[in-house]
């Protein structure tokens, strides 16, 4: 956004940001999603992006529950959604079992419906279709040692 001088409105809801965001024009709201009046959320339109990096734990009343059952159904067609730490069709990494993540079970159900069109999965393409990285122009991107690509991009229909 800064590099290309793109006019935008970035709202980040993160109760505990882990990294400094100095110099970025971001409206930080440090309130857990469970304490937010959903009527006050920004209205997203076609072409907007909803970037989700949640607790990854889908239990009643969790942020994942609120996102999937209340926020996503409100989105109009053409909104892009990014989920982080999604390894479909595989389970979470073995060394992550202690985290007890289950979000991707819910994401699997979303993908089975008709509201969300999968656009890109960095994990899937790197592990199941790496030949397409060159076709898409992503073969130049280096992955840091020990990191796992895990971005899933969807578009609402």
Named regions from a protein language model:
Residues 3-54, 59:
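S-adenosyl-L-methionine
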Residues 43, 56-156:
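C-terminal substrate-binding/active-site "lid" region of AdoMet-derived donor-dependent transferases
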